[in-house]
Structure formats: structure tokens, C-alpha cells
Amino acid sequence: MAITVRRSTMVRPAWETPRVRLWNSNLDLVVPRFHTPSVYFYRRGPEGGGAPEGFFDGERMRRALAEALVPFYPMAGRLARDEDGRVEIDCNGEGVLFVEADAPDASVDDYGDFAPTMELKRLIPAVDYTDDISSFSLLVLQVTYFKCGGVSLGVGMQHHVADGMSGLHFINSWSDLCRGTQIAIMPFIDRTLLRARDPPTPSYPHVEYQPAPAMLSSVPQSVTANKTTPPPTAVDIFKLTRSDLGRLRSQLPSGEGAPRFSTYAVLAAHVWRCVSLARGLPSEQPTKLYCATDGRQRLQPPLPEGYFGNVIFTATPLAEAGKVTSGLADGAAVIQEALDRMNDSYCRSALDYLELQPDLSALVRGAHTFRCPNLGLTSWVRLPIHDADFGWGRPVFMGPGGIAYEGLAFVLPSANKDGSLSIAISLQAEHMEKFRKLIFEV
């Protein structure tokens, strides 16, 4: 599929913005150091309105983007380091990259169920990380126009700047301005609210920051990894309907006194079980599940509405594969227990624990974290991922524009609000073949 760039612009804030260095909290620094990829798809429909050339008009989008960058001014900055080498944001107003491109031979339908493959990643501008961290835009955007009249919006957002909730706050505010309405909630830009206590006093062991379990073997995994190339991976997306989810829940005990499980805990237990079975994990194999949780409402008092930054804490259920695969209730119980632990006391302790670590970069999760026998499952179900209406209608799909690591998965809500949930996941290719069958056994 050929994609040709029509125009590439560095969009700066429409008005003068504060020239400051923004301190990053520990939560801003234990995230992957690349741009989080996501892609929106929009179909040309009767609700689009306007002249054909007006659909996703680049000039209109650029003007609104420049306006949005005024209150969200850190997004227009660059990464920098303070005198101690700690990464911070230099709010210098240098701008964000906005690309307009054409895919004259492709249509939205060519992307099928929108699995986050390399084809999807091509809809997002590539970022060159070889130079200094101050060299690249913190936000890269690409509007791609297809032959069918539809478009995609590819977004790459540097993770130090924002988590999913804050990133969507920006994108949705930009779309509001483009549509002609005002920003509903202004961003709150002060990350010192997430400073550790003085002195730091962690009160939990914080297993979420301990190394992930390795495969049980007579040969250390690191030894075998050096002698063999990593096995090929596959990426796919699977849709579970509302009735599928109901059948899953029916497998759990009910009635008075029965444990209560969130929808996430039930679905996560099913995915964890299917992945463990597909991988053929022995029953005694420890396996760790990484569940990203938003701390905004868990902290007391809650953070101000519009807090802009990373507030992701991680719940990490840990169990032997035999327990995970024995039945849905056992896995769901382990997951729910870990989620219920994530209260204000635990989250404040996590901030303190991170403050005492000599090198936060050593705790950044990556391929070594999620690979077999472990799993990361991030839910976007409570995020407003379908609210970016730039004036030409809501997206028909929004999801990850690629999955960086084997063993990482995302739960996505349906754009048409039919109660279905989709799981986008990356696994070793041979494991994916088995997972495709297992995931629908509900």
C-alpha cells in the first residue's frame, strides 16, 4: 500500500505560552520511552456534511490544533534533563508534527477488523530516536485520506507527557475546538501533586516493580535467548459479544455470599487462562499479569479534574499457571484481589517505593516484562476513545496502532456501543494459532 505525504507541518501554539521546565513525577518516568501509537478511522457518511474537499480539512484541523496547544502547552515542548539527569519537559513551544498524506489505492475496508499490524503503524509518522531526547516532537499526527473518501488519524504520543486519559483529554479537546465548541475541562498542569512523601515510607513490597517470572527450565532463559533468534510473533484482534461476556460470567458462582468480580476481572481471567493454555505452561509455572489502573479516583483526595500527566499504577496478580487454567473463578479471584488492593494507601506507598529506587529507568517495562510466561492486559474500556468528533462524525474505530511486545494485549470497547469488547493481542505465532480457538470457548 502506497502512502504519499501531501504536507508536513510543525504546528506551534496559537499564542504565547509559559516557557518553563515541567517536573515529571515518578509515574511519568517509569513508562516506555517511545510514542504510544493509536489510530482512528472515520468513514465518509451522510453525517459528514460539507463539500467533499471540506472533509477533514487540513487547514481547519491545524488552526484548532494550534489553539489546543495553548492550554496544553507541555505537548508542544521537548524532553530535556535537569542538572541531575532526570527527564523533564522543556515547555519551549517548538510544536507538534502534523502530516497530511494520501493512500490512493487503499480504503478503510482494506484494514478489516483493524488489528494493530505493521500496516496500521504506517498510518502514524515515524519518530527518529537516534538523536538527543530534545530532538523529536512529543506528539506526531497524520491524517491519511483513502480512495473511499474515509480517513485515518494516526497519533504517536510520547509517554512521558501523558497517559491514555490525559492523551485523550488533549485529542478530544482538539476535536472540540475543530468542531466549533469550547474545551470542556481545562488541563491541570502541575505534577508535584504526585511527589513522594518526605521521607518516603513505602508500606508494601510492591511486587509490580519486581522482575517478572522467567520460564522454569534447567537452562537459564538468558543463555538460550542469546543463542536463538526470538520466535516470530503474530498480532490479531478478537471480538467477544455481549452474549459471549454473559456466558463467561455464568461460569462464576452466583447468589448470596458469592464473590463479586468486575467485568475486567472476568475477561482478564479468561484471557490469562487462554494465553497460558496456548503457551502450554506447566501447572507449576509462575505467571504474572500486569493490569494498568488509573489512580485518579483511587488517590484521596482525588486529583483535580483535568490533571495532565501519567497516573497509572499497576496491579500485578501472580499465580501458578495451574491455578490460572483450572477455572475462571480462581483466576478472577486472584485478579480482583490485586485490583481491590489499589487504594490510596497502596498508591502513595508505590510513589514512595519508586522514590527510593536508584535508577527508575531500570523499572521501565518492555519485552522482558510481558513475554512468555507473563501477560500485560490494558483496558481502554473506560477511556473516551470514540469522542474525537472533529466536525465530520465520530470514529468507526479507535485502537492501538501497533503492539510493541509479545504478551501485551488491549481491551477495547465497541464504537457502536453494542456491549461487545475486543481483545487486541501479540503472541508468538505458534501460540496465536491455539489462542484463536481458545478465546471463543466461553
Swiss-Prot record:
Its EC number is 2.3.1.-. The active site is at 159 (proton acceptor), 389 (proton acceptor). SUPFAM superfamilies: CoA-dependent acyltransferases. Pfam families: Transferase. InterPro entries: CAT-like_dom_sf (IPR023213), Plant_Fungal_Acyltransferase (IPR050317). The keyword Acyltransferase applies. GO terms for molecular function: acyltransferase activity, transferring groups other than amino-acyl groups; hydroxycinnamoyltransferase activity. Expressed in roots, leaves, stems and seeds. Keywords: Acyltransferase, Transferase. Hydroxycinnamoyl transferase that catalyzes the transfer of an acyl from p-coumaryol-CoA to various acyl acceptors. Can use feruloyl-CoA and caffeoyl-CoA as acyl donors. Belongs to the plant acyltransferase family. This is Hydroxycinnamoyltransferase 1. The lineage of its organism: Eukaryota, Viridiplantae, Streptophyta, Embryophyta, Tracheophyta.
